[in-house]
């Protein structure tokens, strides 16, 4: 593959993961969960959450294909299942995010910095079923070592943006406002729904081909 092909693959991987992980849409959630803490504790929560989220995605994308092979599950089946979950998630965001409100309520009951960093921030907010599905699919279908590295790099870039959004959360929210961040989240949710439908149809098409239909 030439350089243009690699760049195109990297851009596709990055945009897919960015839309699914949704840094702008999840920023108000992070602010709501951490506003009762001091700046020092917010920094700790942010660092731990982004590192843990990236490690979860990295480990699952690298090992996910092998685990699926062990259980005899195809990537096409993962696409179908992941696409359905992604579509449900996108509808939830478009309708107001009832599950995210539940995450808020549970996190607000905890005073443990480590607990909040792991749940709900790292998992499932920043590394949910959709991100894991996309990571495994992208990594498994990467044709060579360079493409696999580009998938990992695209994930690292997205989580770097997540971290930067936490650091500059105050000016970002001042610029966009809470309603602006909500609008951005809902716009991304439309693209998320499109990705979900594409995953499902790709998976179904691959299933039909494998059955010679």
Curated annotation (Swiss-Prot):
Claim: Transmembrane is one of the keywords in the record: yes
Coiled coil: none
Domain of life the protein comes from: Archaea
The keyword ATP-binding is annotated on this UniProt entry: no
UniProt membrane topology term: Multi-pass membrane protein
Cellular location(s): Cell membrane
Keywords of this entry: Cell membrane, Membrane, Transmembrane, Transmembrane helix
Membrane-spanning residues: 1-21, 51-71, 75-95, 118-138, 142-162, 181-201
GO cellular component terms listed in the entry, alphabetical order: plasma membrane
InterPro entries assigned: Multi_antbiot-R_MarC
Family: Belongs to the UPF0056 (MarC) family.
Protein name: UPF0056 membrane protein AF_2111
Source organism of this protein record: Archaeoglobus fulgidus (strain ATCC 49558 / DSM 4304 / JCM 9628 / NBRC 100126 / VC-16)
